[in-house]
Curated annotation (Swiss-Prot):
GO terms for cellular component: bleb; cytoplasm; cytoskeleton; cytosol; intercalated disc; membrane; nucleoplasm; nucleus. One of its GO terms (biological process) is establishment of centrosome localization. Residues 340-411, 470-500, 566-619, 1020-1143 are annotated as: Disordered. This is FH1/FH2 domain-containing protein 1. The keyword Glycoprotein does not apply. Belongs to the formin homology family. Keywords: Actin-binding, Cell projection, Coiled coil, Cytoplasm, Cytoskeleton, Phosphoprotein. SUPFAM superfamilies: ARM repeat, Formin homology 2 domain (FH2 domain). Residues 355-368 have a biased composition (Basic and acidic residues).
Length: 1164
């Protein structure tokens, strides 16, 4: 054993020492190999590392001739395949025997071998590509391969192995088909294989098709497998019928024709085949749940002469006893379902056929005529028809309470009040209700109706006013293109129904300076358009709604906290008025009155420790030294009476967290403080790479390069004069701003042109002179650039602010985030031995860095596990805070600068417009520009209000999270959002891994329920061992001796059926040893092989063949009691079998005329 292991108390071990061997199974059909080397060497495995990372070392140690990428580890002798993606500790639940060996001081053995999927693919490739003797040997070995590795069976089924067997068997002769049926029988003996056959309908169809084979051995084996399949579960009978009908529709033959041909004995007489066939039919009929399915099967058989076949075999003197029993059973089941007999022979009890009543017939006809579903009509019991009171009483309350229970709600919130009246009027009053309650309800209806009419009228009037005031603004402001296209001085373009000009004029006249603080520095050049209106409109920028930002958020709560904190410093204890709930006195200078719906956040968070952060016991017990969490503890002091905040019902987030109990003993063990390894210090990053800059580029080349992407010079001049944005794009305007001619360049070009008037100017010089000829060029370009940039600049500012506002709401309302904080706080309080009320969220960056000292798993991994245990319905957190994750990519300090730049550019655009007024400017163009700049000024002012209120809300949000005002001032929005984003991303990744691990464990538990389990261990076949026949047909290997009694025979039979044929995983044998190592047992029943069968078809049977024969024998020998007709569902009460309809449903004279009367030779 390596150091660090603990065998005494079963605690996790970090390093385990095992013995390792390899098994050369690259060729899955090579059955003569043994694990090598015979003396297994020892190897130390790290229990905390994934096994996939440790397999190369094991591979090198053993020198295994296997491909490294195809290797897997198998535990010996249990045969469990380890998951290479997980560590040993993560698979501890599935390795109880493995760790039990370690606890006893032993060294378990691991086998390095080929993965199951690789071996199965090799088997399928060999079967598909082989032919002749090689295919014959492969099919012969397939059964033994399934016997030796029980984990290979489900992998073979899941890898389309059944389809491979069917495809190979369809193109092979009967000898190959016999080998395939032997392998398929071995598969079906396992529960996993049987479930795979149940889910693969093609296998059942192929088995039914083989019933028509010319080889008796193939037919007999196929019938055996079908018998076991139908007997395994009652749900398999409909699957078998569906397969029969599918084959019949494909081949064009009648259903059940293959079984009827066996009963007709076209290929010779074989009593065993007849017994199996009739038993299969009886077992299928006995498992059918409804009468229609029963009659569909029997009618198809009767149409092919089943009655004549039954009578012929019953009339023969030498008919086998088992065959006679099954035939009589078929006849009695048919007669019992038709109601011709009242008691099943041998059933031991009387069973009356359910007679269809007249009420049931009427009800069925009514449902057929009315198009109703017959399944909803109550079926009568065995004693008589159902009472009609049930439907009447059940539909009565539904009709009364239906409209009231599911009203159709109106889309608008105002019209939702009308919903009250159907609830009042439709709700039925009780029989004992008085007349006074009726009058009271009517009075309430009248009052509510009057109030609703009043509100609807007011709403309609308000809606008309709003619709007339803002016809082109849907809850926000039009974009720059709409403002540009709708100038104020173009009244002819407006419709006479739109009073928007008057509303805008009144709004502009009502502009007044903000009483709190000016938005821009006071200057004599400031225009009135920068002043805010007294009654500000709804805060919305484009499609972003900021209307929930109230005027109370114009004041920064950090300033309020500072003033109130200063007042509280001299006092040794919180003042009594604050404890009684009275709000604190206003600070100096007095701020504007708070008008918002929520009170401001408290000046200082509550000081009382939270109950959920205290450990379970009142006094902390003495414990071992644990790893400490170096978080910054929140000092929640003060006893303010404010009990609610804008973000929740409590003053702080920590006060609203639910208590979380953690396993302190497990945490104490996992995070026990140990010698810390010296981690190498991180190397300092290299210095910044010096940037190479190119100075003094040639002006001419730069202009010529720019001209390649610009329109011709004359087009540029016309576009600049008319502000034609279709001729010059936004990129073109930016290039023109960099290519504007300077005064010095213009003078040099003019002097050169005067000196040489005959020589034309070059392209660059001509371009600069053309631009210089445009009056107010710089003003035009700046105004035009502002017009094109405004929408994008406004959205770049508004969208992050909106995301921040929504992100705070998402985080506060997120239940997963609260659970994470509560769990982490409880864990940290235990590890630190403290009673902290909370911690700064900046510690979330370090949660993934803390690791336990046992398994070296991060604290985040344990946190995910605890959260999933506490709240399995919790989310991954990352997908629920998308707004904050987007905010993590935005520099809000730069956003503030961009907002200031937008204001400055807006003022500069106004100055440019004033300077352009000196030049020639069309009146319509000037009106459009003036209208556009006025609207931009209003929107910039509104954007400034939104920015201020969102930032103040973020400060209040930090106070709600427990930050002090001093700490909140140091928090940057981008850094805060980045911390939450990175933590949420790591939490999602770790949570997915934990869920994947839990899913693998659950899959293992489900897989272990059927892993290697035989169908003889299921409830259906559990009585087979107790029904061992005490006749001379008992196998020789089962009987202990000629003088033994029934008790010994029963014990040996039970041990044979319940024992697995090959329980050892790695005890591989050569093919020459198969016959000698397996008990040779004769087949049950007649074993005389037909002369046309080849010598290789009579194969020696082993234990699995004997088990299959005993299962079939138990099915055929079952008593009539188990096959008594069951009470089936009836969709039509008067349906009879085809035989009874043809004979009993006609008149006596017509029956005699058709020659259908019963003769003496047809009596059963």
């Amino acid at each position: 054993m390596a150091g660090g292991e603990d065998r005494g108390d079963g605690e996790p071990v970090s390093v385990v020492t095992v013995r390792v061997q390899y098994l050369e199974d690259t060729d899955p059909f090579a059955c003569a190999n043994f694990p090598e080397p015979r003396r297994a060497p020892t190897c130390s495995l790290d229990g905390a590392l994934p096994l996939g990372a440790q397999i190369p070392a094991v591979h090198r140690l053993l020198g295994a001739p296997l491909k490294l990428e195809d290797c897997a580890l198998q535990v010996s002798p249990s045969g469990y395949y380890l998951d290479t993606e997980l560590s040993l500790e993560e698979q501890r639940e599935m390795l109880e025997g493995f760790y039990e060996e370690i606890s006893k001081g032993r060294k378990p053995t691991l086998i390095l071998r080929t993965q199951l999927s690789v071996r199965v693919n090799a088997i399928l490739e060999k079967l598909y590509s082989s032919s002749g003797p090689e295919l014959r040997r492969s099919l012969f070995s397939l059964k033994q391969i399934f016997q030796e590795d029980k984990d290979l069976v489900p992998e073979f089924v899941h890898s389309e192995g059944l389809s491979c067997l069917i495809r190979v068997g369809a193109a092979a002769d009967h000898n190959y088909q016999s080998y395939i049926l032997r392998a398929l029988g071995q598969l079906m003996l396992f529960v996993d294989g049987m479930l795979g056959v149940v889910a693969h309908s093609d296998t059942i169809q192929w088995l039914y098709t083989l019933c028509a084979s010319l080889s008796r051995l193939v037919v007999k084996t196929a019938l055996k497998l079908l018998l076991v399949f139908v007997e395994y579960s009652e749900n398999n009978a409909p699957l078998f019928i569906r397969a029969v009908n599918s084959v019949a529709s494909t081949t064009g033959a009648p259903p059940w024709a293959n079984l009827v041909s066996i009963l007709e004995e076209k290929n010779g007489a074989d009593p065993e085949l007849l017994v199996y066939t009739v038993t299969l039919i009886n077992k299928t009929l006995a498992a059918l749940p409804d009468q229609d399915s029963f009659y569909d099967v029997t009618d198809a058989l009767e149409q092919q002469g089943m009655e004549a076949l039954v009578q012929r075999h019953l009339g023969t003197a030498g008919t086998d006893v088992d065959l006679r029993t099954q035939l009589v059973l078929y006849e009695n089941a048919l007669k019992l379902e038709d109601g011709d007999i009242e008691e099943a022979p041998g059933a031991g009890g009387r069973r009356e056929r359910r007679k269809p009543s007249s009420e049931e017939g009427k009800r069925s006809r009514r449902s057929l005529e009315g198009g109703g579903c017959p399944a909803r009509a109550p079926e009568p019991g065995p004693t008589g028809p159902a009472s009609p009171v049930g439907p009447t009483s059940s539909t009565g309350p539904a009709l009364l309470t239906g409209p009231a229970s599911s009203p159709v709600g109106p889309p608008s919130g105002l019209q939702a009040s009308v919903n009250l009246f159907p609830t009042i009027s439709v709700a039925p009053s009780a029989d004992t209700s008085s007349e006074r309650s009726i009058y009271k309800a009517r009075f309430l209806e009248n009052v509510a109706a009057a109030e609703t009419e009043k509100q609807v009228a007011l709403a309609q009037g308000r809606a008309e006013t709003l619709a007339g005031a803002m016809p082109n603004e849907a809850g926000g402001h039009p974009d720059a293109r709409q403002l540009w296209d709708s100038p104020e001085t173009a009244p002819a373009a407006r419709t006479p129904q739109s009073p928007a000009p008057c509303v805008l004029l009144r709004a502009q006249r009502s502009l007044a300076p903000e009483p709190k603080e000016p938005l821009i520095p006071a200057s004599p050049k400031a225009e009135p358009i920068w002043e805010l209106p007294t009654r500000a409109p709804r805060l919305s920028i484009g499609d972003l709604d900021f209307s929930d930002l109230g005027e109370d958020e114009d004041q920064d709560m950090l300033n309020v906290e500072s003033v109130e904190a200063g007042k509280d410093i001299p006092a040794p204890s919180p003042p009594l008025p604050l404890l009684s709930g009275v709000p604190p006195p206003p600070p100096l200078p007095p701020p504007p009155p708070i008008k918002g719906p929520f009170p401001p956040p408290p000046p200082l968070p509550l000081a009382a420790p939270l109950p959920h952060s205290v450990p379970d016991s009142s006094a902390l017990p003495t414990k071992r030294k644990t790893v400490k969490l170096f978080w910054r503890e929140l000092k929640l002091a003060g006893g303010h009476g404010v009990s609610a905040s804008r973000f929740g019902p409590c003053a702080t987030l920590w006060a609203s967290l639910d208590p979380v109990s953690v396993d302190t003993a497990r945490l104490e063990h996992l995070f026990e403080s140990r010698a810390k390894e010296v981690l190498p210090s991180k190397k300092a990053g290299e210095g910044r790479r010096t940037m190479t800059t190119v100075l003094d580029p040639k002006r001419s080349n730069a202009i010529n390069i720019g001209l390649t992407t610009l329109p011709p010079v004359h087009v540029i001049k016309a576009a600049l004069l008319n502000f034609d944005e279709f001729a010059v794009s936004k990129d073109g305007i930016e290039k023109l701003l960099t290519m504007m001619p300077t005064e010095e360049e213009r003078q040099k070009i003019e002097e050169a042109q005067l000196a040489n008037p005959d020589i034309p100017l070059g392209p660059a010089e001509n371009f600069l002179m053309t631009l210089a000829s445009i009056g107010g060029l710089a003003a035009r370009l700046q105004l035009w650039a502002f017009k094109l940039d405004y929408d994008s600049m406004e959205r770049e500012i508004a969208e992050p602010l909106f995301d921040l506002k929504v992100g705070m709401e998402q985080l506060v309302q997120n239940a997963t985030f609260r659970c994470i904080l509560a769990t982490l706080l409880a864990v940290g309080n235990f590890l630190n031995g403290s009673q902290s009320s909370g911690f700064e969220l900046s510690y979330l960056e370090k949660v993934s860095e803390v690791k336990d000292t046992v398994r070296r798993q991060s604290l985040l991994h344990h946190l995910c596990s605890l959260v999933l245990q506490t709240r399995p319905e919790s989310s991954d957190l990352y997908s629920e805070i998308p707004a904050l994750t987007r905010c993590a990519k935005v520099d809000f300090e730069q956003l503030t600068e961009n907002l200031g730049q937008l204001e400055r550019r807006s003022r500069a655009a106004e100055e440019s417009l004033r300077s352009l007024a000196k030049h020639e400017l069309a009146p319509a163009l000037r009106a459009r520009l003036t209208h556009f700049l006025d609207q931009c000024a209003r929107r910039v002012a509104m954007l400034r209000i939104v920015h201020r209120r969102v930032c103040n809300r973020f400060h209040a949000f930090l106070l709600y999270l427990g930050y002090t005002p001093q700490a909140a001032r140091e928090v940057r929005i981008m850094q805060f959002c980045h911390t939450l984003r990175e933590f949420a991303l790591e939490y999602r990744t770790c949570r997915e891994r934990v869920l994947q691990q839990q899913q693998k464990q659950a899959t293992y538990r489900e897989r272990n329920k059927t892993r290697g389990r035989m169908i003889t261990e299921t409830e259906k076949f559990s009585g087979v061992a107790g029904e061992a026949p005490s006749n001379p047909s008992v196998p020789v290997a089962v009987s202990s001796g000629p003088g033994r009694g029934d008790a010994d025979s029963h014990a040996s039979m039970k041990s044979l059926l319940t024992s697995r044929p090959e329980d050892t995983t790695h005890n591989r044998r050569s093919r020459g040893m198969v016959q000698s190592s397996s008990p040779i047992m004769p087949t049950v029943g007649p074993s005389t092989a037909s002369p046309e069968e080849p010598p290789g078809s009579s194969l020696p049977s082993d234990t699995s063949d004997e088990i299959m024969d005993l299962l079939v024998q138990s099915v055929t020998k079952s008593s009539p009691r188990a096959l008594a007709a069951r009470e089936r569902k009836r969709s039509r009460g008067n349906r009879k079998s085809l035989r009874r309809t043809l004979k009993s449903g006609l008149g006596d004279d017509l029956v005699q005329a058709l020659g259908l009367s019963k003769g003496p030779g047809l009596e059963v």
